[in-house]
Each structure stands twice: as C-alpha cells, then as structure tokens.
Swiss-Prot record:
Organism: Sus scrofa
Assembly mode: Interacts with T-cell surface antigen CD2.
Free-text tissue specificity from the UniProt record: Expressed in all tissues tested (lung, testis liver, kidney, spleen, heart and skeletal muscle). Highest levels in lung and spleen, lowest levels in liver and skeletal muscle.
Protein name: CD59 glycoprotein
GO terms assigned for molecular function: complement binding
Membrane topology: Lipid-anchor; GPI-anchor
Length: 123
C-alpha cells in the first residue's frame, strides 16, 4: 500500500475511533445514602470519566459519576463537605458498588506513583 493509501487508512481508523467513543458514556450507580443497596444507574456526562463510591463518617454513602482527575481526598472532602471518608474511584460501567474495595487517598497515590515509575523505566 502506498503512502497515500496508508494515510487514508489511518484517517478512517481515527474517525471510527472518535465515533465509537462518542457513542458510549460511562454508567455509574447514582444514590446518596440509600436505605439499601444502590440500584439506580445513570449515564455520566461527557466530562465525567469515573464512578465514585464514598463512605463518610457519620455513616453516609455516596454513589456518583465523577472526574477521574478529581479523585483525591482533599477535593472529594471539600466537594461533599465531609471531613472523614473513604473512597473508591473506578472507570468501568457500574463499578461503584458498595462492596467495592475502598482505597484511601494515600494508597491510591502510592499506586499511581508506582505505575508512573514503572512506565518511566520501561521506556
């Protein structure tokens, strides 16, 4: 295939990737302090690329769509007006179940740092 044919194929694949991405929005459970388990699901807006589950003290739970780059203790605590909490952010459909593993902010930061270091050394 000539360079023109390769360029056209790359262009078509790029358009297809964009169209496929536009057709799917993340789904998350969406409840605040449900009486039982949360079963209400919603489609997240285009700028919300994560689901979040929060357990706050005194007992209060949140299930929501969220922005992954805002998944940190300080932002969540300030935004939800909760001082003591555990949270889990995830990026798959309906992944914010109450039985999901809860990560503290420090654990999430450690995992991110290890991933960045591994990626850096592999390049």
């Amino acid at each position: 295939m000539g360079s023109k044919g390769g360029f056209i194929l790359l262009w078509l694949l790029s358009i297809l990737a964009v169209l496929c991405h536009l057709g799917h929005s993340l789904q998350c459970y969406n409840c605040i302090n449900p009486a039982g388990s949360c079963t209400t699901a919603m489609n997240c807006s285009h700028n919300q690329d994560a689901c979040i589950f929060v357990e706050a003290v005194p007992p209060k739970t949140y299930y929501q769509c969220w922005r992954f780059d805002e998944c940190n203790f300080d932002f969540i605590s300030r935004n939800l007006a909760e001082k003591k909490l555990k949270y889990n952010c995830c990026r798959k459909d309906l992944c914010n179940k109450s039985d999901a593993t809860i990560s503290s902010g420090k654990t999430a930061l450690l995992v991110i740092l290890l991933l960045v270091a591994t990626w850096h050394f592999c390049l």
